[in-house]
């Protein structure tokens, strides 16, 4: 009974459980903020978390903080959370990106996805047109990068589901 739920996280989980069997995956996309109740509730209700991280110091700090929260939560026996990953976005060929990538590899290990999303004007254009990048720029490097991310994500999810 939804009236007996004690928190918004429980409320979200209750409604997700009502439709969970109807879908292979339910994706909750939240804004990337440090102290968002929406983000906290989404993580609490999630089976898996993918953390996109822009290659800058502020985003790195936020991503590491979110990753840490998720790691702690995944160790709680009451948690549904089974997998966590981080994907680098807005990647360019600059020194700052290389430095960020190396720090992420060192801190995150296998949680860091191999697939990366490059910085591209096609992404802004896609957002403006309300069309997914994988359709609007499918032959461009950024479109192929999103396809590679999907394949890697699917592979990781399949492995986690087997266990």
Identify what each model region corresponds to.
Residues 11, 65, 145-148:
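Charged catalytic carboxylate motif
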Residues 1-24, 128:
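P-loop/Walker-type NTP enzyme "switch/lid" segment
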């Amino acid at each position: 009974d939804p009236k007996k739920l004690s928190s918004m996280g429980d409320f979200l989980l209750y409604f997700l459980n009502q439709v969970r069997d109807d879908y292979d995956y339910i994706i909750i996309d939240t804004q990337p903020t440090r102290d968002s109740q929406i983000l906290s509730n989404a993580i609490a209700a999630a089976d898996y978390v993918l953390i996109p991280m822009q290659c800058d110091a502020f985003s790195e700090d936020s991503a590491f903080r979110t990753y840490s929260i998720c790691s702690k939560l995944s160790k709680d026996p009451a948690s549904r959370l089974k997998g966590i990953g981080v994907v680098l976005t807005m990647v360019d060929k600059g020194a700052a990106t290389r430095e960020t990538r190396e720090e992420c590899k060192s801190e995150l290990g296998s949680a860091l996805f191999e697939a990366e999303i490059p910085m591209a004007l096609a992404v802004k254009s896609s957002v403006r047109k309300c069309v997914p990048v994988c359709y609007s720029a499918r032959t461009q490097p950024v479109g192929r990068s999103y396809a590679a991310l999907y394949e890697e994500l699917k592979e990781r999810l399949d492995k986690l589901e087997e266990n």
